[in-house]
Amino acid sequence: QQHKAIHSFPTRRSSDLYEQGVRSSFSQWRVGEANAYLRSDHVAADFVDTFTPEYSAKALCLVSPAWDEEASRETKLEKIITQKWIACYPEGCEAWAEQRRTGYPRLFPVLVNKSNGKIDTRTMIRRLNFPVSIISGNPAQYSALCEYLGGPDTGGTRLWWDTGVNFRD
């Protein structure tokens, strides 16, 4: 609902819906009261690898939990989706779908990409490959699926709904 609120004319303030969503998540996971968290202006910290400093990385997600009614629409969307990602993270596939759909939250980049160029380091894996049971068990179906996919059967090929307009520099 809060996602819809910033893209239309809501009957309730988007801040109310945002805070309601965070409070619901806190309640669902029984992690206490959300008030202090919702007032927090803390942002993600840089990752510092003390053993291999070249693996250290600057934080990319720089939005805090505190709602700012004066923030840009895009910043509000980033806050909403980041909180949604946190809330649905235990359901990894759902969290991954949200991140692919919106580009939020902004995640640390892959530092060692072993995909032989099949997966973009910045946008990460976009889909899972078709299972071996289809590839070997029904080659005609596999060929048809690859044709409908519109690209190779790799983790870097975008799905029909994954338009690529969801990543910002």
PLM ranges: what are they?
Residues 1-2, 83:
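Glutamine-centric residue-chemistry signal
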Residues 2-14:
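Short, small-residue-biased leader/transition segments that mark boundaries at the very start
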Residues 13-23:
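Extended, well-ordered alpha-helical scaffold segments
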Residues 26-169:
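C-terminal functional modules
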